[in-house]
Amino acid sequence: MPKLQSEPNTRELGQLLRHWRKTRNRSQMEVSLDAGVSQRHFSFIEIGRSVPSRETLIGIANALEVPFRDRNTLLLAAGYAPMYADTGWDEQEMGRKWPRA
């Protein structure tokens, strides 16, 4: 089991998850079913009473279709190290000429 990198900020994590759930117009039940966790456990995570495992958090992020660039924020709030590289367009890609349609 991965160790926590820092003290979890359960309030921030819950607020972030609630934001993504509302943005996606999903109920707690829908998200919990898609993530493979009980609705009660998801509710406890969202209100800050429980800290999910890294795997559970990734499953919830998948269920909510959280963009990869925003998943690191969720991981950090839960006390885990980020796992997604923050890569942008590099100069070579920006200078590439794309074929016209």
Q: Which positions does each model-derived feature cover?
A:
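Alpha-helical residues within the helix-turn-helix
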Residues: 22, 33, 62
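Residue-level signal for the short linker/turn that defines the boundary of a DNA-recognition helix
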Residues: 15, 25-26, 52-55
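A short, Lys/Arg-rich alpha-helix, primarily the initiator
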Residues: 1-24
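Recognition helix of helix-turn-helix/homeodomain-like DNA-binding domains
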Residues: 35-52, 59-61
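Residues in the helix-turn-helix
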Residues: 30, 41, 51, 70-73
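Short amphipathic recognition helices of helix-turn-helix/homeodomain-type DNA-binding modules
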Residues: 2-3, 55-58, 62-101
